């Protein structure tokens, strides 16, 4: 997993319910915790673009519901700034279900994916149809 050059604001708190935009069968997932989050004692973990999270499937197919999985944030509404000065924000918050190595479980990703995610997780970049 490669580092991100941009300073991404962590805008998605633990407990947030977010759309899942791949074809695994999950529609809505809830963030339980964030992998490799180092924060202050008693502070709720929060995630931004390119962070891997432990999620619970809230809505989806009966086989997928109530499962604990890993997912990566591919879009967030909160604006962030790239090193070239460009400000980027998306219309919604979205996640993609992955395995431990960051390889997506689905074969299709709906909507755009941030370039920072494609740099950190190359397999998500190849699966995505649009990279912004």
UniProtKB/Swiss-Prot annotation:
Q: Which GO terms describe its biological process?
A: translation
Q: Which InterPro entries match?
A: Ribosomal_uL14, Ribosomal_uL14_arc, Ribosomal_uL14_CS, Ribosomal_uL14_sf
Q: Which GO terms describe its molecular function?
A: large ribosomal subunit rRNA binding; structural constituent of ribosome
Q: Which domain of life is it from?
A: Archaea
Q: Name one GO cellular component term.
A: cytosolic large ribosomal subunit
The record's Pfam families line, in alphabetical order, gives:
Ribosomal_L14
Question: Which UniProt keywords are listed?
Answer: Ribonucleoprotein, Ribosomal protein, RNA-binding, rRNA-binding
Q: Which residues form the signal peptide?
A: none
Q: Which PROSITE patterns does the annotation name?
A: RIBOSOMAL_L14
Oligomeric state and partners? Part of the 50S ribosomal subunit. Forms a cluster with proteins L3 and L24e, part of which may contact the 16S rRNA in 2 intersubunit bridges.
Q: Which NCBIfam families match?
A: PRK08571.1, uL14_arch
PANTHER family per UniProt: 50S/60S RIBOSOMAL PROTEIN L14/L23 (PTHR11761), LARGE RIBOSOMAL SUBUNIT PROTEIN UL14 (PTHR11761:SF8)
Give the family this protein belongs to, as stated in its UniProt record.
Answer: Belongs to the universal ribosomal protein uL14 family.
What does the UniProt function comment say about this protein?
Binds to 23S rRNA. Forms part of two intersubunit bridges in the 70S ribosome.
Kindly provide the name given to this protein in its UniProt entry. Answer: Large ribosomal subunit protein uL14
| Species classification | Archaea, Methanobacteriati, Methanobacteriota, Stenosarchaea group, Methanomicrobia
Q: Give the gene that encodes this protein.
A: rpl14
């Amino acid at each position: 997993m490669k580092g991100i050059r941009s300073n991404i604001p962590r805008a998605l708190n633990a407990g947030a319910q977010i759309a899942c935009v791949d074809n695994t069968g999950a529609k809505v997932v809830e963030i339980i915790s964030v992998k490799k989050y180092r924060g202050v004692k008693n502070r709720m973990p929060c995630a931004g673009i390119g962070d891997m999270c432990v999620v619970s499937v809230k809505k989806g197919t009966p086989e997928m519901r109530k499962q604990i999985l890993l997912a990566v944030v591919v879009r967030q509404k909160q604006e962030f700034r790239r090193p070239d000065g460009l400000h980027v924000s998306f219309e919604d918050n979205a996640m993609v279900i992955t395995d431990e190595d960051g390889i997506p479980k689905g074969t299709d990703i709906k909507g755009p994916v941030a370039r920072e995610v494609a740099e950190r997780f190359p397999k998500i970049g190849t699966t995505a149809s649009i990279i912004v």
